[in-house]
Amino acid sequence: MKYLIFDFDGVLGDTNASRIEVIQNMEGKSREEAILSGDQYFTKSTHTRDLNVSEESLSVMKDWTTKFGNLLHQNGFNLFDDFIKELKKIKDVKMAVVSSGSIIYIKPKLEKCGLEFSHMLTFEDHHSKEEKVEQICKDWNIPVKNAYFFTDTISDVKELGSIMDKNRIYGCAWGYQGAERLSEVLDENHILYTFSDIHKISWILK
């Protein structure tokens, strides 16, 4: 059995253009400012487990995420349908999604994509991706280091590299930060340049 956990935005969901528009509207930023602030956030997450976020700050983050989620859902976006098609070819697999985004825009898309995800854990469930990955692996009854993770951001690689097997963390070049930025934390054998590259992975089945 293969155990695959996916980030959503930029990996399964083609949300970048819509996200930039929403950030511009929510925060009054120019397109360039929205892109720059996004790259900074995707390089160093502001809500990892070790940051000890206060309840007050967490409440503000949740309110922001809800507003963002509603606007992104209204604005609309597509999935990376060709990647979804490649994932459907993988046999003997369990899949899950963890995201710092909102269930508001993620769940409606994934429910219709034809893939089965045992979990869709978002910011509403916990602010830390470490916590969410650990919960999924606990429910799957496997060690965390047995799961694979697919992301498009440096911050995810840094955050989850402390608890997961780094050899099972892969970057998706079609996502937010692209191959050049991902190459700062991943070697080329751990970057998927095309959707079909996922079939080049030599799965470790334990």
Q: For each predicted feature, which ranges?
A:
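Structural recognition of alpha->loop->beta junctions
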Residues: 114-123, 182-205
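Acidic, Mg2+-coordinating phosphoryl-transfer loop and its flanking beta/alpha structural elements
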Residues: 150-195
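Short, acidic loop-to-helix structural element flanking the phosphoryl-transfer center
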Residues: 70-103, 107, 111, 130-131
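Short beta->alpha linker loops
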Residues: 78-82, 101-102, 124, 128, ...
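Conserved Lys-Pro-Asp/Glu-containing loop-to-beta segment of HAD-superfamily phosphomonoesterases
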Residues: 130-160
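A short, structured active-site edge motif that brings together acidic residues
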Residues: 35-39, 115-129
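Short amphipathic alpha-helix with an adjacent loop that forms part of the alpha/beta core around
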Residues: 134-139, 200-206
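N-terminal helical cap/lid subdomain that shapes the substrate entry/recognition surface
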Residues: 2-81
